[in-house]
């Protein structure tokens, strides 16, 4: 999921101290592309071969515990160097600048978090430079990336809408919240709305911008409850939507009477499901799309599966164009399987 607020200054300090990113020497450059090749290939692999992840908000627990952990573990297993770069806060312009700063060093591959459509031009530059480039998490249209691997947000919204209709018996007032304007979440909102359309007695109150902030989500939820005392359900689309909605529902003493669904399956979300405050979670397979995305870069670099005499010269990209990794559905019946 995309951008999420850190809960406390103390946790931020602890996290930063625990998340030392590997050093990177910008003077180290990989081989340039053969003028006849569309991307750089290599017959050999070494510990100095560098794969770079470029994200934003690099200290977010969701990213640190899933994406970055999986990427680092993949590098250790494969015997190559992995580097994680990006701003500490949610800062798309700095993510773009980071991508552009990395390109001249020609790493073996770029794994880029699809945070915002605005990063498309920087991705196109990386591809034009012959760097194997995979976008993960959310698709970036017009980026010319070699591969996208991640979640189908429309489907995540549809799953929430279907479960909400089931929880409410097909009737009642509902609202959604997340980060307005982000392509993935807007797709999620559409999926939710399409799922409840067959139920004329379900009244859609609209979508609200919680800015991925727990306090903002709680305030919006409280305002919705105040303005609509008969509200029956709320659905969340960023990692902090669920905890914020849950806080408001608990404070209003409406647990079990206002049904909640949301994305992500962090420990806080799981505990709220176990406590009966949140009814349903749609989790992403973050470790899967990160590790597979990195492996696709390696396979492209080393021609693991050749589709022609020389894929780079033939203009053939020997990895999947698009991979949807699916979702994980969690409720009271299986939540115990996810609590560590």
List PLM regions with ranges.
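Sec-dependent signal peptide recognition
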Residues: 2-11
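Hinge/cleft segment of the Venus flytrap/periplasmic-binding protein
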Residues: 20, 25-49, 195-196, 292, ...
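Extracytoplasmic "Venus flytrap"
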Residues: 37-44, 48-78, 83-96, 113-117, ...
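An alpha-beta-alpha
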Residues: 52-60, 71-72, 159-207, 297, ...
